[in-house]
Every structure is written in C-alpha cells, then in structure tokens.
Curated annotation (Swiss-Prot):
The gene coding this protein: PRA1A2
Topology relative to the membrane: Multi-pass membrane protein
GO CC terms: endoplasmic reticulum; endosome membrane
Protein role: May be involved in both secretory and endocytic intracellular trafficking in the endosomal/prevacuolar compartments.
Family affiliation: Belongs to the PRA1 family.
Transmembrane segments: 51-72, 76-98, 142-162, 163-183
Descriptive protein name: PRA1 family protein A2
Length: 209
C-alpha cells in the first residue's frame, strides 16, 4: 500500500471502521528495529503506517500513562476510564460488539427491556441500508453515549482537580506515540497486514451490494 497517497482523513476513517479486537503486537516486534526516515515524505508514510498497524499498542500506552498520572486521584482515574470508553465507542466494531453483548446480558433478566434496546429498523433500498454508517448502542445513536461519557469525565476531572494531570499524561503519551511511529521501521508483516485489511474492506463493501 502506498501510504504517501493516503490522507489523514482516510487513516482516521480506517481506524474507526477496523477491527480492534485483535491483540496488541508483541514487545519484541514493537521494539524491534528503529531508523530515522530519510525524507519528509518517508516520515509521513511511516507515521500513518505505524499508527494503523500498532493502534492497539498505542491505545494501551495511553491508558497506562493516564493510569500512572492519576493513580492518586481515583475520581479522575474513573473519568479517564470513561474517556477511553467514549473513544472506543467511536470504533464501529467495538460499539456493535458492546451493544450485542450488553443486550444479550439484559435479555437474561428482562427480555422486554432487551427488545426495546434493539436498533430501529433501517429501510433498505437496492440492497443497501439508507443509514449504513449509523451505529446504535442500546437503541440510541452512539454519539449520545460518547457525549454523555465525555461530559461525565470532564466533571470528574474538574471535581478532583486532575485536569492538568490528564493534559500532561495525554501530551506525554502523544509525544511517545509520535516518536515511536516516526522511527519504527515498518516490517513485512505490517505491509502484509495492510493488504489483508484492504482485502477485507473490499470484500465487506462487495457483500453489502
């Protein structure tokens, strides 16, 4: 895949739609080979490739740094967990998987309530849903939960006076991620994984026709 021709918006869209259930890459692979890029275009290509390939490792890194920064502030730590959950809801596969598991659990106690949590019926025109991009969680659009969790986390951060620590932790983790993604040399496994994800995306679009 030619990452030079991939825009930042395309990377964000791919991260939103890709499966996040895959385990993180091993430490041996994560810290394997490092080298500085030879040009600005090479740096941009490597940065986008590594952000996509090591996405799970970077997400765990952010959670770990936030946990260290807020270990003495339990309320702010809960706020950070809510923020991580709201960010995870932005991913299609996570939101759909969470919705199914939560409704399945509720069904054991109240089938009637679980039925109400099902997403509304989407009209289909020529084999395609008119709202294919709309993802529902417990019968509500996922942005409702994203905004609710983000608001609750901000309230907890202000209440615990941990907002400054959160900013420090986020900036630190962001700096570490950018440095690692910039100097980590993409290996053959990363390129093969990219081709596999491309094939899955094409096959998914074909199956929806």
């Amino acid at each position: 895949m030619d990452w030079d021709n991939v825009a930042a918006e395309d990377v964000i869209e791919a991260l939103r739609e890709v499966e996040w259930s895959t385990p993180p890459r091993s430490f041996g692979e994560f810290f394997s080979r490092f080298a500085f890029p030879r040009s600005f275009s090479k740096w941009k290509s490597r940065l986008k490739c590594n952000l996509y390939y090591y996405r799970t490792n970077y997400f765990i890194l952010v959670i770990f740094v936030l946990g260290l920064a807020l270990v003495t502030r339990p309320l702010a730590l809960v706020g950070a967990a809510l923020t991580a959950l709201s960010i995870a809801f932005l991913n299609d596969s996570f939101a759909a998987s969470f919705n199914e598991k939560f409704i399945r659990t509720i069904r054991h106690f109240s089938p009637h309530m679980a039925a109400k949590m099902r997403p509304p019926h989407m009209p289909v025109i020529r084999g395609r849903s008119t709202a294919r991009k709309t993802v529902y969680v417990c019968g509500k659009p996922r942005w409702v939960f994203v905004i609710t969790f983000l608001t609750a986390s901000l309230v907890m951060w202000f209440s615990s006076c941990g907002l400054l620590w959160v900013l420090y932790a986020l900036l630190t983790s962001l700096a570490v991620i950018i440095v690692h993604a910039s100097i980590r040399t993409p290996n053959l496994k990363a390129r093969l994984n990219t081709f596999r994800e491309e094939f899955r995306a094409v096959w998914r679009n074909y199956s929806e026709l």
